[in-house]
Design a protein with these regions (language model features):
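N-terminal targeting segments with Sec-dependent signals, encompassing both cleavable signal peptides
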Residues: 1-274
Length: 274
């Protein structure tokens, strides 16, 4: 009997040592955070179902929300300690993501307003394309920055621009290929197809980079409120990969198909980490 009592006492001590007791206020705070999280995740999954493009930021944001929810659940179950500062950080992140999901700002620059063949400098972008980018930057300010500032009047905010460039399968002119190779920090394959693919990947990246920098410049000229910074754009060069079009692309898909010469742009605003 004495041995049994000692056994139960040890079990109680071990259980207590592995549990983190919560106050009523802490439990209420966790419940409220979970409600916001569940709503934000449902809204993010809904926009993914409408815009299932794998290059968009929504899947990453949904994964981030699920990771936060998993951690909050562990805290609520007493498996990890409650941290007020961490909960405050999570709340800011979740509300920021939710605002972006509710007010998406994105564009696709098609071939009609895009760069000419082999071109990538912003000075070579059409005036219609530049006007579209200025309108895109204005939408970020009006639809995202101002709304997040209303939620967090004193917090620093960060604007994140994400650009994804594409190219077709057409070989480049010799003069452009030589000019492009001068700036590369890697050797160019001698085999024609591999060479073309590498140069088109570099071309698509430079187009995305030019567009991202132009949008950043426009945003910085438009933003007048304090504590708002524009991060360095996140640029991707997809080369000859087929852009997601929302529907299956059936062959023949011509090498010079105009649907391949595009750039996708996404804007998001978040509470800046401290």
């Amino acid at each position: 009997m004495k041995t049994m009592k000692i056994f139960f006492a040890v079990c109680i001590l071990l259980t207590a040592g592995c549990s983190h007791w919560l106050t009523g206020e802490q439990r209420q705070a966790l419940t409220e955070i979970m409600e916001i999280l569940n709503t934000a995740i449902a809204e993010t999954e809904e926009i993914i179902s409408r815009k299932p493009d794998p290059t968009s930021p929504w899947r990453e944001l949904a994964d981030k929300l699920r990771t936060i929810r998993e951690h909050v659940s562990r805290i609520k179950e007493g498996k990890e300690p409650y941290d007020f500062n961490l909960m405050s950080k999570y709340t800011n992140e979740v509300l920021g993501i939710q605002m972006n999901v509710q007010n998406p700002v994105d564009r696709i620059l098609g071939v009609d307003v895009f760069f000419g063949p082999g071109r990538y400098k912003i000075s070579e972008l059409s005036e219609e394309g530049k006007e579209m980018l200025r309108a895109f930057a204005s939408d970020i300010v009006e639809m995202q920055v101002k709304k997040l500032r209303a939620l967090f009047p004193d917090q620093p905010l960060s604007v994140v621009i994400r650009t994804i460039g594409y190219a077709d399968e057409m070989p480049m002119s010799p003069w452009f290929a030589e000019a492009l190779k001068k700036d590369l920090h890697q050797s160019v394959p001698a085999e024609p197809v591999a060479k073309r693919q590498m140069l088109n990947r570099e071309l698509s990246f430079r187009r995305a980079q030019s567009i991202g920098e132009y949008v950043k410049m426009q945003l910085e000229s438009m933003l007048t409120m304090e504590k708002v910074t524009v991060d360095s754009p996140i640029n991707f060069g997809m080369g000859e990969a087929l852009p997601f079009a929302g529907e299956p692309v059936e062959p023949p898909y011509m090498p010079q198909d105009k649907r391949r010469r595009i750039c996708k742009i996404h804007g998001n605003v978040f509470v800046a980490p401290r």
